[in-house]
Structures are given as structure tokens and as C-alpha cells.
């Protein structure tokens, strides 16, 4: 189940390649989220390696922002710790370059730091560092033309979120302009681990009619939940808050992360 780690001198793996590889094996993907620089840049190397060793197929690496509107308290606190530890854009790209993982890396951040850095420059430097995709939850699809253009120029996937409240008309726009995977929000509100998978998840999966892989996130924390989401028709399960909480607690972090990633991936595999 563990995914081999290697240096990325020969370029980053595309998200579509990873999903094609998993599809051939009839496997669903585990996408693991952590915040870059929490509790330190140095610690992030071991954290990412632990998730990949546990079976994570894609890593979503957060870049901290001071006003993270889509994040719950757990991830907000992680962002504050990362900012306090000195994480900035240049350090983020340096960290990404040094990770040396074979799995695709997705950057999740907010539009303000991207805009201040320069949209085209940010995307170019992200691609150069080894990022394969970009998630910016606070930019509407209607306002993302420049960002989409830069992503196409440098070969990054631009990944949009779809919520139960998203209209069918907007879903169609997202399916036209998004790539890599579609991020389905399994419940309303901000991120955070929750007790069970909502009924709206199945309904949302049925509304999003596309060949682009569908990834469900926000609130998944156990292998049983991951299996339920996979059985409901998701191509991937996104898990974040529970990993970030383990990091915050601080004891035996990498061992716990690897064990939980293995449990989640086993749940996904068992749902086939």
C-alpha cells in the first residue's frame, strides 16, 4: 500500500496520471491535507512522508493565510502556527522542491496571497517547484479566467469546489473550467471532522455528471467513513482536519499519521 518516495528531478506527476493509474487497479484515491510549516518546515517533510507511506495517493499542501474563510478552527490554528514559524511563499516553494515525493502535490491557499505575489508568477513558481494542481476556494469560477490561463500555460490543474448549494448552472461552468478533480464538499459549513457521512453527499455525487474524478472532502476522519464515501461513487476521499489535529497534539505524530492513512486507504480499498 505504501507509495514509493523519490526525487522529482524528472518532473511532477500529473493528477490525471495518478487517477488513470488507480482506475486501472479499480482503486479509489486517498488525498491527504496538511498545512505546510505546521509546526515547522522541517517537520513537514516527515509528516508528508508518513502520509505517503500510509497510502496517500495525492498530497494537498496548505499555504497559510491570515483570514482562511473556508477553514474550521483546527486548520485555522494550523495556519497561525505555520505563519508564526515563518512560513511564506518563498519558503513554501522551497519546501515543495525538497519533498521528493512521487505522488502529485496540490497547493491549497486563498486568492489574496496569490494576487499579491502576482498570479502568473505564483503559478509559474508553483509549477517549477513541483506543484501539480491549485485549489483556491475563495475565487468564484466566473472570476478565475486569468488564473485558469496561467494554470494552462504552466501545466497545473485548477480545482474548484462544489457544495450542495451550488446551482446546476454553476456546476456546468465548473466542469467546463476545472481539471484534475472536482472537490465536492460533503456538508455545508467550514472544514472539520464529523461523526458520519451526510445523505447530501450521495445526492451531490449524482448531480455532478462528469468524467473528471470526483473527490469528496470536509469532515471525513475514519476508514468506515472513507468506505461509505467510496461506495457512494466518489473517485477520491479527501481527509485533512483529523491529520492536522494529530499534528497539533504532538506525540508520536508521524507514526499516528501513517497508521491513520493506512486505515483510511484500507477503507477505500475495501469498498471496491
Swiss-Prot record:
Single GO BP term: L-tryptophan biosynthetic process
Q: What is its EC number?
A: 4.2.1.20
Annotated PROSITE patterns: TRP_SYNTHASE_ALPHA (PS00167)
Q: Which InterPro entries match?
A: Aldolase_TIM, RibuloseP-bd_barrel, Trp_synthase_alpha_AS, Trp_synthase_suA
In the UniProt record, which is one GO cellular component term? Answer: cytosol
Keywords for this protein:
Amino-acid biosynthesis, Aromatic amino acid biosynthesis, Lyase, Tryptophan biosynthesis
Q: Which reaction does it catalyse?
A: (1S,2R)-1-C-(indol-3-yl)glycerol 3-phosphate + L-serine = D-glyceraldehyde 3-phosphate + L-tryptophan + H2O
Role noted for this protein: The alpha subunit is responsible for the aldol cleavage of indoleglycerol phosphate to indole and glyceraldehyde 3-phosphate.
UniProt record similarity statement? Belongs to the TrpA family.
Q: Which PANTHER family match?
A: TRYPTOPHAN SYNTHASE ALPHA CHAIN, CHLOROPLASTIC, TRYPTOPHAN SYNTHASE, ALPHA CHAIN
Q: What is this protein called?
A: Tryptophan synthase alpha chain
In its UniProt entry, the species of origin is given as Methanosarcina acetivorans (strain ATCC 35395 / DSM 2834 / JCM 12185 / C2A)
Amino acid at each position: 500500500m505504501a507509495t514509493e518516495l523519490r526525487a522529482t528531478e524528472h518532473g511532477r506527476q500529473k493528477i490525471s496520471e495518478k487517477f488513470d493509474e488507480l482506475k486501472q487497479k479499480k482503486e479509489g484515491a486517498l488525498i491527504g491535507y496538511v498545512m505546510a510549516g505546521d509546526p515547522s518546515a522541517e517537520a513537514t517533510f516527515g509528516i508528508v512522508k508518513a502520509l505517503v507511506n500510509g497510502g496517500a495517493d495525492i498530497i494537498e499542501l496548505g499555504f497559510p493565510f491570515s483570514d482562511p474563510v473556508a477553514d474550521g478552527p483546527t486548520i485555522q490554528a494550523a495556519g497561525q502556527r505555520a505563519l508564526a514559524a515563518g512560513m511564506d511563499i518563498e519558503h513554501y516553494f522551497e519546501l515543495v522542491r525538497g519533498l521528493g515525493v512521487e505522488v502529485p502535490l496540490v497547493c491549497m491557499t486563498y486568492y489574496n496571497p496569490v494576487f499579491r505575489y502576482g498570479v502568473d508568477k505564483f503559478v509559474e513558481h508553483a509549477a517549477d517547484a513541483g506543484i501539480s494542481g491549485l485549489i483556491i476556494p475563495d475565487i468564484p469560477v466566473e472570476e478565475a479566467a486569468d488564473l485558469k490561463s496561467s494554470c494552462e500555460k504552466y501545466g497545473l490543474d485548477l480545482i474548484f469546489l462544489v457544495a450542495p448549494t451550488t446551482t446546476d448552472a454553476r456546476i456546468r461552468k465548473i466542469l467546463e473550467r476545472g481539471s484534475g478533480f472536482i472537490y465536492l464538499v460533503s456538508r455545508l459549513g467550514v472544514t472539520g471532522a464529523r461523526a458520519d457521512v451526510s445523505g447530501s453527499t450521495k445526492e451531490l455525487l449524482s448531480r455532478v455528471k462528469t468524467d473528471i474524478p470526483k473527490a469528496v472532502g470536509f469532515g471525513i476522519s475514519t476508514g468506515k467513513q472513507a468506505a461509505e464515501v467510496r461506495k457512494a461513487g466518489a473517485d477520491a476521499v479527501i481527509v485533512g482536519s483529523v491529520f492536522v489535529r494529530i499534528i497539533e497534539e504532538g506525540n508520536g505524530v508521524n507514526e499516528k499519521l501513517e497508521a491513520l492513512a493506512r486505515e483510511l486507504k484500507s477503507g477505500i480499498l475495501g469498498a471496491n
